[in-house]
Design a protein with these regions (language model features):
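Conserved non-cysteine loop/helix-boundary elements of the Radical SAM core domain that shape
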Residues: 557-594
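Active-site neighborhoods and metal-handling regions in enzymes and metal-associated proteins
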Residues: 1-558, 563-567
């Protein structure tokens, strides 16, 4: 059944329910960046497989919004469909709210599954529709009604993260959160984001691909806590441990009844940016304190134990990636290698490292023109052979018990054109300048983003994605609230970079139809002294994989930039020390790449 037939069935349901529009987002019940298969209704209906996008279906047309990362991919996957591509943020492209205001009649009805739509997005739509007396029908999962073979809701076993890995016990975290609640006057704290629940309880799961979280909600009061979860995913031992520290268990789907049962006027803190619309509607009688969860900043600022573990994880990851680069450059052109088989080979190298848990996201292994598609993921349909020329852009990562990694290396596979060498070098200039930044405490990513982009801007080049994102500790590979981007997303507050945060440093350049360049390291924000101007911070590089000097146009690098490139060498020495006593062959592979 193609997308046109699926939309026809959906429109039949819309007509039966008296709906003038139906909105399908790319979210689960928790506002997660990546979602389990059960929640991929937008993908099922449209055929667009990117991780970000919103589908709006009208009685006689349909449109899909996505961001700059996916413009090329969406154009390709929607070609020949009846769905119009809306390139969000581009000139002349209306917002979803403005589009609905133009198309939905006075007194009309807009439908959506309120469990998957964030309260913030619903408010944005309502503001755009103000004055039209439009009704929201938010209790109808029409997409599910026309999806006969929908996957079941995930219910994978939960496991416990050792306290020595986290640096704080769950009891200590609950105590700290209750202190924050007293400061804000919250009587109840509702945690709806999966990574926040997992972080608070030092638990991990496998309900979302590549993200070690489990489907759950957590209600926290001063004297008690309730975890709404599918109880079959908890072992008897874990249940006993949770109860022992004051955490009661309740069915996952009971969250809305429990919220409605909170006495009127009770001060309840939740975050409309992540809490779904049904959560907020269930709190209609409470005094809602709408603000970011205190967990967000607490988990972003890694404990000393987490910081030390992150370093250990990157040594392991560095060994695996160096071995992969050595293998790839030695074998390309001599044996059949495709994007998919290369990604599998890198995964096999990571799997040989102790305490490896799995990939932190689906690998981007992109040869030649595919590298220009920012978030390209090879599939059986798109897979191509690697040839001894141009670049292979490898954006990959892994979860280890000691931490999460995210690295991009643009690997030369053979002779390069002058344009490829120039682009590789200019992007590296931006990466080095940002990584070397020393800056006052209190600055945010917006202030620093220009350091990475300026070398490209000077050449009339740019990239249509953020420069950096936070990284969780055996959680989401993308986490906030910190980010590096000159453009602030709508309704998002600025968060200053702080000691202990982990951020990516990943400028890029993409020549459509030709090649893509991205250089990505993870950086740990560290204190850099204090003087009469206040405290200063700097970045400590965590990633320990060298950049390929054979791809550089050295004449474009200043002496300072060459020195910065050489300054990364001590990290490679740590890789060598980590393996020289156990595996001489691996040591040779690392030295060859370095």
């Amino acid at each position: 059944m193609n997308s046109a037939e699926k939309l026809r069935l959906l429109r039949q349901r819309m007509q039966e329910q008296g709906m003038d529009a139906y909105v399908v987002v790319t979210d689960d019940f928790h506002g997660s960046e990546y979602v389990g298969d059960y929640f991929k209704a937008r993908e099922y209906l449209s055929g667009f497989t990117g991780s970000a996008g919103t589908l709006v279906v009208l009685p006689d047309s349909a449109a899909l919004w996505t961001d700059g990362r996916y413009f090329l991919q969406a154009a390709d996957q929607l070609a020949g469909s009846t769905i119009d591509l809306m390139r969000a943020g581009q000139p002349g492209v209306p917002t979803i709210g403005a589009f609905l205001a133009q198309r939905v009649p006075q007194g009309g009805t807009v439908g959506f599954d309120g469990r998957t739509v964030s309260s913030l997005f619903a408010r944005t739509m309502a503001a755009a529709l103000e004055g039209k007396n439009v009704r929201f029908a938010y209790e109808q999962d029409l997409a599910g009604a026309v999806w006969p073979d929908r996957p079941a809701l995930s219910a994978q076993p939960v496991w416990e993260l050792p306290a020595e890995c986290a640096g704080l016990t769950r009891e200590e975290k609950l105590r700290l959160l209750r202190e924050k609640m007293r400061e804000t006057g919250a009587e109840v704290l509702v945690l709806t984001a999966l990574d926040e629940v997992a972080w608070t309880l030092n638990l991990r799961g496998d309900d979302v691909r590549c993200t070690p979280v489990f489907l759950s909600f957590l209600l926290l009061r001063q004297e008690e806590a309730t975890l709404c979860v599918q109880e079959q995913i908890l072992s008897g031992e874990l249940k006993e441990k949770l109860v022992a520290c004051g955490v009661a268990l309740a069915p996952y789907e009971s969250i809305y009844d429990r919220l409605r049962a909170i006495p009127a006027g009770t001060a309840v803190q939740t975050d409309s940016a992540t809490a779904n619309y049904c959560v907020l509607q269930s709190l209609s009688g409470a005094k809602v304190l709408d603000r970011p969860s205190p967990v967000q900043l607490m988990k972003a600022m890694k404990t000393p134990a987490e910081q030390e573990n992150f370093r250990a994880a990157h040594i392991k990851d560095g060994v695996a990636v160096c071995r992969f680069i050595c293998w790839l450059q030695s074998h390309v052109g001599k044996e059949p290698i495709t994007e998919c088989s290369a990604a599998a080979k890198l995964e096999s190298f990571r799997a040989q490292q102790p305490d490896y848990l799995g990939p932190s996201f689906d690998s981007i292994m992109a040869f030649g023109p595919h590298g220009a598609i920012v978030h390209y993921e090879p599939t059986a349909e798109t897979d191509v052979p690697l040839e001894p020329r141009s670049f292979c852009l490898a954006d990959t990562g892994g979860h280890y018990l000691q931490g999460t990694t995210d690295i991009t290396r643009t690997i030369p596979l053979g002779p390069l054109t002058e344009e490829e060498r120039r682009a590789y070098t200019v992007v590296l200039k931006g990466h080095l300048r940002l990584g070397a930044a020393r800056f006052p405490e209190g600055l945010c990513g917006q202030n620093l983003d220009i350091l990475a982009r300026l070398p490209l801007w000077e050449q009339g080049m740019d990239y249509n994605h953020g420069t950096g994102h936070g990284v969780g500790y055996v959680l989401g590979v993308h986490e906030g609230p910190q980010r590096l981007h000159w453009r602030l997303p709508e309704n998002q507050k600025v968060t200053a970079l702080a000691e202990g945060m982990v951020v990516s440093n990943e400028p890029g350049y993409y020549a459509a139809g030709q090649f893509g360049i991205r250089h990505e390291n993870l950086e740990l924000v560290q204190r850099d002294g204090e003087n009469e101007y206040g405290r200063f911070l700097h970045f400590e590089p965590l990633t320990m994989v060298p950049f390929d000097r054979t791809a550089l146009e050295l004449s474009l690098l200043s002496e300072e930039e060459l020195a910065l490139l050489r300054s990364l060498r001590p990290g490679l020495v740590q890789l060598e020390i980590g393996v020289q006593s156990t595996n001489q062959d691996t040591l040779k592979e690392i030295r060859r790449v370095a």
